[in-house]
Amino acid sequence: MGKRPKRKIVLFLVEGKSDQEALQLAIPELYDEIDEDIEVYFPIIRKEEEEKGGDITSTNYVNKQGKRYWVHPSNIEEAIYELFLDDFFDKEKILPKDISEIIQIVDTDGAYIPDECVVLDSSLSEEDSPFYKDDKIACLDVDKIVKRNEQKSENLDYLSSCKTIKVKQKTVPY
C-alpha cells in the first residue's frame, strides 16, 4: 500500500457556531477560485468535554486529563491543538502534514481599552455584564474584566506575531 497523497487543507479556527456559519458560506468559494483541490474547514473551539464555543485568548479550560488551566503565550499553541484540532483531526481524518495554513478568527472584546475605561455599574444584571459602550466597558467586577483584558491582549499580541505554529511535530503557517 502506497503513501496517501497530501491534502491541501486550510483551517479557519472559530469561537462559535455563528462565526462558522457566517464564514463557511463565502470563504470556500474564494479558495475554489485559487485551487479547487483546497479543502476549507472551520473547527470550533471545544470548551469543556463536548461543549463547543468560547474564547481561547481570555478564559480557562479543562484539558482531557481534567486539569483546568489558563491560556497564556507560553501554552497557547498547545491549547490550540488540544482545544481546536485534536478531536477535529480524528473526526475528519486529517494529519498535521495536510494543513497548508491555519487562520484564527478572534474578537478583541475590548482587550485594548485602557483600564480606567472599565467601570463598575451595579445596575447591570449578571447576564448583561460586561456591557460594551462606545467609550467604556460597564461591568459588575472591574478587576475581573481588567485581568481578562490583560490576558487576552497578551495572547492576541503573541498570536498576531506568529508566522507559524506547532501542530504536533509539524510547523504550520499561521
Briefly describe each language-model feature range.
Residues 1-174:
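Acidic, divalent-metal-binding catalytic cores of TOPRIM
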